[in-house]
Amino acid sequence: MQSISPAIFGRTHHQTNNSYATKVITRTLTILCATIAILLLSSGEMWAQGCILARSPEQGGLPTGEGGILEPGHFQITVGERHQFSYQHYVGDVYQEYRAQDRTQVENRINLVTTNLTYQWTPRISLEIDLPWLFATRKSQNSPVKYSATGLGDTILGANVWIRNPEHAPGNNLSVGLGVLIPTGNDDVQNTYDSNTTGVGAPVEVTAPVDYSIQPGNGGWGLVMQWSGYQRLNKSLTFYSDGDYIATQGGTNGVQRGATLSTTQPLNNYVAISDQYLLEAGVEVPINKVRGLSATFGPRDEGVPARNLFPNSNDGFRRPGFAVTAGPGGQYVHGHNILTAGIYKAVHRDRTSSYPDSVYHTHGDAAFAQYVWLASWTHRF
């Protein structure tokens, strides 16, 4: 759910009448966001923190409060972009430098474009639908083969409710929500490629599923639990926090890994349907000289647990782990439009041990990104 800052809408403190500066900022930010989106979309053909498949959307943690609430009977549409390039391999929290030295790094280039439509049913209750679209590529440094996947991801239908009536809660509030993850995304995108990478002899064409980290779909249903809250610390500083957890049905999605089935590690023969989560927090400060502009800073923690919340089955191949990132962001509101952007740098990455890893006494690796780029545009009507 894309949330909006209480320090922006209906703000009466520290406003400026410098309309020329406002127009310049509006044009500059609009051009900047459009340029970023074009560059990111053209740089590669996902939801994911590299190989571990933590799929969280655009920046969504900005607080909602007095004047920033969506009025009953009104809609808002948000289009968000997430971009990252994952190539640094970790086993646990140990960086595998030899992968770079040997040029065996696996590189995932990911773009996730999400469209979210929210309807404010009552002052406290809102309904939403979230439609992601994935563009992703994957290749190994020492191989000419490049895999790609594009398509609609898994859809989320949800409802959110404020604990307190927002009209009477200008200083703090908490929203909780429930939703359902619908497996509308394809979890079995296949590529045809030449497996003869020696450059000698005739081509050997192979058709097989791409790695699950760039598949648009997860292959299973899920229960979405989310929350968002804020606390005004003073007239110019607001603390915000939010998170979500997607508890899936578990088991496997039936998509086979590799050309042949393993007899030594049968639990890894098929792809697991994994849970995922996101936690974030931060502070927001208005930029007093420009009406509608504010800056944010805070950390994010997103990842895939080794074991699902519902104890159905943890069989199947997954790359569990998490990445903690932190960085600055910004939000600009003009009329019925809101622009947000953020750049988050990794401060801790950890590829944890999966359930099959614990059974077979192994510990696989995963590729992580150094930076995550987020941007969104929201229109209210």
Segments the model singles out, each with a brief description of its role:
Residues 81-87, 131-137, 163, 180-186, ...:
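Transmembrane beta-strands of outer-membrane beta-barrel pores
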Residues 90-101, 251-381:
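Outer membrane beta-barrel transmembrane domains
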Residues 65-67, 79-81, 115-119, 129, ...:
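Residues on the lipid-exposed face of transmembrane beta-strands in outer-membrane beta-barrel proteins
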Residues 135-272:
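Outer-membrane pore/translocation modules
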Residues 73, 109-113, 149-155, 172, ...:
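Residues that define the transmembrane beta-barrel architecture of outer-membrane proteins
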Residues 49-52, 65-74, 86-88, 124, ...:
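Short loop/turn motifs that connect adjacent beta-strands in outer-membrane beta-barrel proteins
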Residues 51-54, 83-112, 213:
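Surface-exposed strand-loop-strand hairpins of Gram-negative outer-membrane beta-barrel proteins
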Residues 43-48:
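Sec/Tat signal peptide C-region and signal peptidase I cleavage site
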